[in-house]
Amino acid sequence: MPRFRMTVEYDGGPYVGWQRQENGPSVQGAIEAAVLSLTGETVSIRGAGRTDSGVHAMGQVIHADLSKAWSPYQLQNALNAHLRLAGERVSILDVEAVAEFFDARFSALRRHYLYRIVSRRAPLALEAGKAWWVPKVLDHEVMHAAAQRLVGRHDFSTFRAAHCQANSPVRTLDRLDVTRSGELIEIRATAQSFLHNQIRSFAGTLKLAGEGKWTPDDVEAALEARDRKACGPVAPPDGLYFLQVDYPDVIPDRRRPVTDADDGDNLS
């Protein structure tokens, strides 16, 4: 069957998360319903990452197998029409026909995420639900210095959810940068895969550093504790965005490469 790779944007606010669930609407369910409405086919799509309720995406990547060899342009337009008619907050940004052994999850080399904090006294109006409002002045330079203590290959037990299902807490964090533009603070993270709640745990901990409550040494000590109780508060989902997924130019002809990503990418 023809396999299609799609890049997807969504507002995570109305959904219980990426993954199809019984307790409410999901992004996966919305796209699968659009495919069913368009083609009459019941499909199971796979995403590069399983975001939690309230987490947004600018560049989630999925793949789906369809019986018809659609032109990517027609498939994109048709799916977007069905999503729009259904009132979904989901948009298909790009469609590409790919080899049958491409896998949105297991073929990924790197995943990029963004966490947005608005640091100001006034509550959010336009940005409500799209960023974490912190009514204090945060020192982004201290936050960035603390973030560098987390870069590299570590046991991130401190920064994963208690119910995280990954087999190993060890991950290689390629990048964790903190920048500021006016009242907006951005935390950007890159790795092959992340643990459940890892980035939101980073954001909550780095906020403590920005407030002057923790030093970079305290953040490093929390990492070395390998204990969830040593973590700062978990930041809310509103500020988290799945930005982009990197893939090799040539996808190896194998279904399931053995990498960190074997544990998946169930972060948020």
Curated annotation (Swiss-Prot):
It catalyses: uridine(38/39/40) in tRNA = pseudouridine(38/39/40) in tRNA. Its EC number is 5.4.99.12. One of its GO terms (biological process) is tRNA pseudouridine synthesis. The active site is at 52 (nucleophile). The keyword Repeat does not apply. The keyword Isomerase applies. It is an enzyme of class 5 (isomerase). It holds the Pfam family PseudoU_synth_1. Homodimer. NCBIfam families: hisT_truA. Formation of pseudouridine at positions 38, 39 and 40 in the anticodon stem and loop of transfer RNAs. This is tRNA pseudouridine synthase A. It comes from Rhizobium leguminosarum bv. trifolii (strain WSM2304). The gene is truA.
